[in-house]
Amino acid sequence: MKITRQKHAKKHLGFFRNNFGVREPYQILLDGTFCQAALRGRIQLREQLPRYLMGETQLCTTRCVLKELETLGKDLYGAKLIAQKCQVRNCPHFKNAVSGSECLLSMVEEGNPHHYFVATQDQNLSVKVKKKPGVPLMFIIQNTMVLDKPSPKTIAFVKAVESGQLVSVHEKESIKHLKEEQGLVKNTEQSRRKKRKKISGPNPLSCLKKKKKAPDTQSSASEKKRKRKRIRNRSNPKVLSEKQNAEGE
C-alpha cells in the first residue's frame, strides 16, 4: 500500500514539475486543520513528508493561520505548536488578519508563482484550490498523507497550453529568463540606476517682474499733517501771570 501511494505521488509530482515548474524544496503551506490531523494521527511531518514526496520539503504557514490558532484556544494548542515550528511566509494581510483558509487561498493567486502546495483538511478550501490551475493539494486520510491528483481545472489548463491557446506561468518565466541572458531585456534595477534626474529650469513665476506699488495719497497726506511742527509759546511765564492778574482786576 505504501509503495502504491509513493508511485501515485511520484506521478503527480512529475505532472506538476513538467507543466508548472514545481521543484525542490517543495514548499508546503499548512493550515490549522492539517496540523491538527497530523497531531491526532501521530504523523511526524518533518520526517515523513520528505520520504513521501521523495525530495526536500519546507513546512510553511502564514501569520493569519497562527493568529487563527491562537484565537481558537486550548483545544488546538498542539496544532499551534506544530504551526509555530514552520517557516512563516509573508501574506498580504499584515495589518488586518483574515481566516486561515482565505489567507492560504490568496497565497496561490495569479498562477501560484511560488509553487506552493496547500495542505488542508478544510473541504471548502480544497474545492476552491482545485479551481486554481497548478496548485498541488495535500490532505490526511486514515492517518496517512496523500498528494491529490491534478484537478480537472488543472488538466484543462495544461491541454489549452499544449494546443497553443494559453501560455503557462512557467513558460513566461523561462522566456523572460532567456531574454535577460541574451540582453534583449534590460534589468529594471540597472535601468533605474541609469536614470538621472533632469535639471529643471527656474520657476517661471519667479521670473516675473515685480509690480511697482502705486503711492498711497491718503497715507502721504496724513504723514504731511503729522509732520507739521507745533508752535510753542516761548514768552516769559512771569509776564503771562501779570497779564492774567490785570485782566482779573
Swiss-Prot record:
Bias (Basic and acidic residues): 240-249
UniProt KW keywords: Isopeptide bond, Nucleus, Phosphoprotein, Ribosome biogenesis, rRNA processing, Ubl conjugation
Biased composition, class Basic residues, residue ranges: 224-235
CC terms in the record's Gene Ontology section: nucleolus; small-subunit processome
Phosphoserine modified-residue sites: S174
Disordered as annotated region, ranges: 180-249
GO molecular function, one term: mRNA 3'-UTR binding
InterPro entries: Fcf1/Utp23 (IPR006984), PIN-like_dom_sf (IPR029060)
GO biological process: endonucleolytic cleavage in 5'-ETS of tricistronic rRNA transcript (SSU-rRNA, 5.8S rRNA, LSU-rRNA)
TM helices/strands, residue ranges: none
Position of the Glycyl lysine isopeptide (Lys-Gly) (interchain with G-Cter in SUMO2) cross-link: K179
Subcellular localization(s) per the UniProt record: Nucleus, Nucleolus
Main function: Involved in rRNA-processing and ribosome biogenesis.
Record family assignment: Belongs to the UTP23/FCF1 family. UTP23 subfamily.
Protein name as it appears in the record: rRNA-processing protein UTP23 homolog
Source organism: Homo sapiens
Lineage: Eukaryota, Metazoa, Chordata, Craniata, Vertebrata
